[in-house]
Amino acid sequence: MGDKQERGLEFFSKVLGEDNAAGMREHIGSSDFGKECGNWAIDFAFGTVWTREGLDRKMRSCAVLGMLIALRQTDEIKYHVRIALANGLTVQEIEEVLYLSVPYAGFPAANSAKAAMIEVLREVEGEAAG
C-alpha cells in the first residue's frame, strides 16, 4: 500500500468512521467489480486532494458541498454532510452552504440537496440519541 493510499484511508477513517474505512479497505483489496473506483477515490480524492495544505477541512467541505449541490449529486451529498460534520461544520453552516447555492445552482438543485441533507441530519440526530 502506497503513501497516498495510507493517507487516504486514514482521512477516510477520521471522517466516515473506522467501520466504513474497514469496508473500503476490504473493497479495494478485493477482486470486486468497480474496486478501482474505490482505489482512485482513496488515492486521489482522499489521499491527495483532501490532505493537501492550502485550505482547512471545513473550507474543503463547504466547497465540495456547493459543487455537489450544483451537480445534483444527492447520494454524494449524503456522504459529504457526514464528512462536513466530522470536519467541524455546524448544522447552521451546512444550511448556509445550501442557501448560498440557490442563486447559483437554482431552487430545484437546492431543494433536492435539502431533502438529502435533512435525511442525513435526522439519521445523525438519531444516532446521537442512542
What does each model-identified segment do?
Residues 41, 45, 62-67, 97-104:
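Short alpha-helical scaffolding segments that buttress acidic/His motifs in well-ordered protein cores
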Residues 105-106, 121:
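A short hydrophobic/aromatic micro-motif that marks alpha-helical segments and, especially, helix-coil
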Residues 107, 111:
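Substrate/cofactor-recognition hotspot
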Residues 1-57, 86, 112-130:
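Acidic, glycine/proline-rich low-complexity segments that act as flexible tails and inter-domain linkers
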Residues 62-95:
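Mid-chain, well-packed structural core segment of small domains
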Residues 33, 55-58, 76, 93, ...:
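Residues at the start of alpha-helices and the adjacent loop-to-helix junctions
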Residues 22, 55-56, 61, 77, ...:
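A generic structural micro-environment signature
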